[in-house]
């Protein structure tokens, strides 16, 4: 898979809700070919990769002070509850606890 295509999707991943079908269309590939290329190059499906990228973007937005609801909708989740489940699945903690833990760690480092 061309690196440029992956970079393009990385840009899209943090801004809205894209799925494998939309990416395949953007890349002028069939969905099946895109899935094969992704699995070969990255070891996971396009949708799993996209979910991971969206949650990484969510972490940054949450740490910048954005509310969970705003982050969820900004990253294309149609329901806050779906965002919360996805966040917890990938981070083993809730979004609110993630922010609390990260801000405490930052304070601890600052006081050393």
Where are these regions (language model features)?
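Basic, amphipathic alpha-helical hairpins
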Residues: 2-19, 38, 42, 59-67, ...
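Catalytic cores of transferase enzymes with a strong primary signal for eukaryotic protein kinases
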Residues: 8-10, 32-34, 46, 50-53
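Append "Primarily bacterial transcriptional regulators
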Residues: 21-30, 34, 38, 71-78, ...
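Terminal helix-turn-helix DNA-binding modules in bacterial transcription factors
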Residues: 21, 40-78, 100-112
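Nucleic acid-binding interface residues in structured DNA/RNA-binding domains
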Residues: 94
């Amino acid at each position: 898979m061309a690196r440029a295509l992956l970079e393009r999707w990385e840009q899209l991943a943090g801004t809205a809700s894209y799925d494998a079908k939309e990416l395949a269309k953007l890349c002028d590939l069939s969905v099946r070919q895109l899935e094969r290329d992704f699995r070969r190059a990255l070891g996971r499906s396009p949708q799993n990769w996209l979910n991971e990228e969206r949650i990484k973007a969510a972490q940054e937005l949450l740490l910048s002070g954005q509310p969970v609801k705003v982050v969820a909708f900004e990253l294309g989740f149609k329901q806050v509850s779906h965002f919360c489940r996805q966040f917890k699945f990938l981070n083993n903690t809730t979004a609110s606890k993630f922010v609390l833990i990260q801000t405490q760690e930052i304070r601890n480092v600052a006081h050393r």
